[in-house]
Amino acid sequence: MKKPQTQLRRLLEQLPCQSFVCGKQAYYYIENGLDRALAMPACVFLAGFDQLMLGYEKLDSLYLPREHLRGIFNRAGIVFPALLVEGAVAGRWKEEKKAIAVTLFGSLSARQKKAVLRGAEACWNKPVEWMAL
């Protein structure tokens, strides 16, 4: 929305909005009554060009740490399938013939790796092949 901040603030005040600050950025939402702890699984395999990745300014994403930006968005415009672990992009994935190839951007705890393994098994009934970055 290309409107002055004062005008946007007045509009937000008319809505039943809640807000929170992450870093130095304020985010607004309308409560939907869902229990957030139940709403998102520990591991989510997002598709390439998923709206969760495209719906935010890349540099301001709540889900994609800035240091992993090029691991998901390449300079040619490709958006790789992202692996979300506990609400943050932890790597990317690709379905291969016999396994799900997972490339991590950092380390995961044993509990987090188990969530990835369970997620791949539930979605594809295939094992995970851990790839180097």
Where are these regions (language model features)?
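Long, charged, low-complexity, helical-prone intrinsically disordered regions
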Residues: 1-133
